[in-house]
Amino acid sequence: VTIDELTVADEPSAWAALGFAVEGDTCVVGEVRIRLAGQGAGKGLIGWSLRGLDGTAGDSGADLDGLRTTRSEHALPEAVAAHPNGITALDHVVAISSDLDRTVAALQGAGLDLRRVREEPTPAGAPRQAFFRLGAEILEVVQAPPEAIERTGGDRLAFFWGLAFVAPDLEATVARLGEHASEIRDAVQPGRRIATLRRSAGLALPVALMTPVA
């Protein structure tokens, strides 16, 4: 299973202003299309289309435990080597679940390739994470902390949260983004560094920028 397209509730102009190459309503990062559907389309990362789903998963836009998913038969787009901001690829998609085992079962049932479950808390307090390999990209599903589940009134379906991109020259990319990017720090993954886009960037979802895998 591989990612064809992500649909994000942002205006194309917002991404272009941050140094992404945008044509019409589409931005191709690596081999993934990002369709910028506008602020009126929803909130954040609305959904995705996947190639190679098992069975009838995604045939009619059915959710995978809350993650809006459609089946794609599209060929790979022509890859974009690098955007003006220096970003070259999508590293991973982040989703959050109140019940990690339930979400993992739904994703595996659709044919997604579970690589591992990390049974250690993250610095942000998430107790567990599951990682799925989707071609060159990763889906990271994060178990919501108990206090977050309590705040939202108990169990809820999984939802998309954010994106992480690869910037080989992270210092140059952060300099290009100026006040819209955070300071660079060590990532949780050993040997990698990370920065994030600030709210001033004006995007509809959290975005991280990372150095490539060492």
Model-found features: residue ranges?
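A structural feature that tracks compact, well-ordered secondary-structure segments
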Residues: 103-106, 140-154, 163-168, 175-176
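Vicinal oxygen chelate
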Residues: 1-10, 26-89, 117-144, 164-165, ...
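Extended intrinsically disordered, low-complexity coil regions enriched in Ser, Thr, Gly, Ala
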Residues: 9-28, 101-126, 154-159, 172-181
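Internal active-site segments that recognize and position negatively charged phosphoryl groups
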Residues: 88-108
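General N-terminal targeting signals
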Residues: 112, 131, 149, 156, ...
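A short, structure-level motif marking secondary-structure boundaries and short turns
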Residues: 87-90, 157-159
